[in-house]
């Protein structure tokens, strides 16, 4: 598996061509912020978008951890041909630290990941592979986890379109060629990107998650727009992580690349959530 901090970010030109073609033909491309295991909320948000067959959805990473149904979120993203994803830092940690043979036990390998939400992800796999009689199928879980991890490990780190860059965390304004920036930067950067005094890409708005609205001093019902503008007066960057796992107004945000519309879904508190 990758997750190697020294590598530069991976792109998928086929995905980029499909998304750009969607926009060129008048279709909607909805970009959704960090889901963090809230499968019911993701499903409700996507249903509210009333997608046509031409429309597409991009998840900005951090599909997993903290919420109760990470296993189901990955299943939704894998199986729906209208959904694409970029890799987030929580998937990177899952790739490095998910120990299927010791699932449910906080081993030394899994300790760091468990601390920041991985425990809920591990439990979601246990829940999905525990029958109504309480029988736990470790064999089936290992097969499913192997497929999920292989799928995650092949995801692009960023998506580049004519007018937008879609990435989990952002870019460094100091590290030169954006296509050669490290995976560590693309999945973890914060302040230096948020505080950039010039656009990191003078032709494209960067749409990102990772950093929550309260971190910008905003309400969760808002989105963050950089005060720095492109030559066409569009914001240089837009942040859409509404912090669906906590705060006073936990919600999930979708941003439409074609129209600029924003749709939000309040987090659905399921019975499962009470168990985690």
Which residues fall in each region the model found?
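Binuclear metal-dependent phosphoesterase catalytic core
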Residues: 233-276
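Active-site neighborhood of divalent metal-dependent phosphoester bond hydrolases
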Residues: 70-156, 195
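Glycine-rich, phosphate-binding/catalytic loops in enzymes
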Residues: 48-49, 73-77, 101-104, 183-185, ...
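N-terminal active-site segment of His-dependent metallophosphoesterases
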Residues: 2-74
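A general structural motif
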Residues: 26, 52-54, 80, 162, ...
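Acidic, His/Gly-enriched loop-helix segments that form or flank divalent-metal centers
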Residues: 123-239, 243-250
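Active-site environment of divalent metal-dependent phosphoester hydrolases
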Residues: 36-40, 65-68, 90-95, 173-174, ...
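Residue-level marker for buried hydrophobic side chains located in beta-strands
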Residues: 31, 59, 85-86, 165, ...
